[in-house]
Amino acid sequence: MMRRLLLVLLPLLAACSGAAADAPKPAIELTGRVVDKAGLLDSATATALTARLARLERQTGVQMVIATTPTLGGKAINDYSLRLARSWALGSKERNDGLLLLVAPTERKVRIEVGKGLETVMKDEVCDQIIRRMMMPHFAAGDPQSAILAGSGAMIEVLEHRPARKVAA
């Protein structure tokens, strides 16, 4: 009886361990609240953003990460950012309230990935306005650091229930 059970369980265990080994690793390793793999931020700005995101998490419980990647590797930014946010397990598991700001300068793409628990606050329209009105003018001027500062600042203002600063279109 025990031998039969082992004969049935061993192939299942082998399949499971193989699947775990084959699970895709995140495209970028989570090393902190600011993960600047594209090198768009100077160290003082990255440090200031890290402190601001830590304060946001202490005050609201929302875990937000800012990430830059040199390239999306041929993937669509929505797929890339969703995979990244899931692999990093951002936010509370119970509240699903993680938030990711992703910038891919090679493809000239920006995405705000919002956990389901924040979708009533960080609606698609809000995210679109932040990207188009707060960030894109800075990107167009060749200043990605200011774009990231403006976008993340607007996101934090929304999360703190303060109206985001309006920028003329």
How would you name each of these model-derived features?
Residues M2-A169:
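A structural boundary signal for the start of the first folded domain, especially the loop/turn
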